[in-house]
């Protein structure tokens, strides 16, 4: 039973990793629901945000264990709406299955200079996909580049 559960979780994460940007072309508005899992949050350390990377924390105070991967995408805010930013070069991430048990948090640091270059001044957010045993969720964390 546990082996089947792990296999389902791996397949779910792989599907989300593959579909994370599907259907949304660069410059198109992103309209999917985000941040709807009660008790789960992705926050960006505003003091450490630069044009080439951020440090963010995933907090899971929900009652569910969450799984996720290393993949992410960046979006830019324009006129109160969010638009996907197209990477300047191919992005390769490992297909690791990472876990955040209920009641825990994890802090990550990422650099996107190779994929996105240096971001100009503006409002941005990182988008990551997560799943529990029942469904998938998008979590976002907003930040500003001066």
Give the ranges of each region predicted by the language model.
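Sec-dependent N-terminal signal peptides of Gram-positive bacterial secreted proteins and lipoproteins
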Residues: 2-25
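Hydrophobic alpha-helical segments, principally membrane-spanning helices and signal/leader peptides
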Residues: 6-8, 86, 107
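Short, functionally important structural connectors and interaction interfaces within domains
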Residues: 11-14, 34, 58, 92, ...
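Primarily secretory-pathway and cell-envelope proteins
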Residues: 22-86, 90, 99-100, 129-146
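Intrinsically disordered, low-complexity Pro/Gly/Ser/Thr-rich segments with frequent PxxP/GP/PP motifs
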Residues: 90-117
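A short tyrosine-centered beta-strand micro-motif
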Residues: 105, 119-129
């Amino acid at each position: 039973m546990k082996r089947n559960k792990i296999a389902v979780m791996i397949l779910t994460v792989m599907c989300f990793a593959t579909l994370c940007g599907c259907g949304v072309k660069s410059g198109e508005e992103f309209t999917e629901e985000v941040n709807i899992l009660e008790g789960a949050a992705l926050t960006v350390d505003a003091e450490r945000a630069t044009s080439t990377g951020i440090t963010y924390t995933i907090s899971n105070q929900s009652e569910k264990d969450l799984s996720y991967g290393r993949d992410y995408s960046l979006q830019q805010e324009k006129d109160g709406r969010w638009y996907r930013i197209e990477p300047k070069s191919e992005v390769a991430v490992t297909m690791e299955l990472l876990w955040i048990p209920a009641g825990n948090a994890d802090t990550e640091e990422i650099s996107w200079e190779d994929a996105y270059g240096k971001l100009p001044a503006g409002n941005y957010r990182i988008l990551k996909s997560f799943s529990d045993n029942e469904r998938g969720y998008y979590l976002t964390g907003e930040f500003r580049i001066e």
